[in-house]
């Protein structure tokens, strides 16, 4: 067992992105396999809690009128200007119920793809003495990959739970996983491949980091 202290980071698994009735699926921006990824992430959350590993949820949340959304995003994707979801305090912005996110859980709100940018995430992780991250969530090739890269550049070793992630298409998901793996930005693990002493396995069956061993 290595000496890393892990946290599980669940990125943006919110109703607005993942649930069929969420604001993004309603405008044709649904994610392939989203609810399956949520179900797998719920397993990961349960495993982490059982091992006393901190679980941190991020939410992509905007103020009323979305003044903090960003001009570049609206310019490149004007259809998003009409999306009224992801407002704080709404069902759309809430974490998917399957994840069991409670009011006293660790939740970091963000307004950019990178969960570290302009947020309290890094001080929170340092305060918890976290030295390595498991990451899962949506969208694989956008917020998940951006956050994984940012974590790597901050010297957090990253393990991506690939079967707990989803993207617009499975191909985009796979390409993102390949990029993170090929450039050694993250180890790739799987919750559904099985566990040995609480450790997720890679798709090949070779054990990766002991991310679910007791902290």
Annotate the PLM regions.
Residues 20-21, 68:
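Short, solvent-exposed loop/turn and secondary-structure capping segments
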Residues 14-19:
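Short acidic, Gly/Ser-rich segments with clustered Asp/Glu that frequently serve as metal-coordination loops
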Residues 22-29, 73-81:
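Short glycine/proline- and charge-enriched loop/turn segments
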Residues 58-61, 138:
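Short, well-ordered beta-to-alpha junction loops that form the rim of enzyme active sites
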């Amino acid at each position: 067992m290595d000496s890393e202290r892990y946290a599980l980071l669940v990125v943006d698994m919110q109703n607005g992105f993942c649930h069929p009735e969420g604001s993004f699926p309603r405008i044709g921006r649904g994610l392939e396999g989203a609810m399956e990824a949520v179900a797998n992430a719920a397993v990961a959350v349960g495993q982490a809690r059982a091992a006393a590993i901190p679980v941190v949820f991020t939410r992509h949340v905007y103020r009323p009128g979305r003044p903090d959304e960003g001009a570049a995003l609206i310019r490149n994707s004007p259809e998003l200007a009409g999306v009224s979801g992801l407002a704080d305090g709404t069902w759309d912005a809430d974490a998917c119920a399957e994840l069991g996110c409670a009011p006293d859980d660790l939740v970091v709100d963000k307004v950019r793809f990178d969960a570290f940018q302009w947020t309290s995430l890094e001080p929170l992780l340092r305060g918890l003495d976290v030295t390595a991250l498991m990451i899962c969530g949506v969208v694989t090739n956008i917020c998940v990959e951006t956050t994984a890269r940012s974590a790597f550049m901050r010297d957090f070793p990253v393990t991506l739970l690939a079967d707990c992630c989803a993207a617009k298409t499975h191909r985009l998901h796979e390409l993102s996983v390949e990029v993170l793996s090929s450039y050694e930005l993250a180890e790739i693990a799987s919750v559904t491949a099985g566990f040995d002493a609480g450790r997720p396995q890679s798709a090949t069956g070779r054990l990766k980091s002991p991310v679910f061993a007791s902290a």
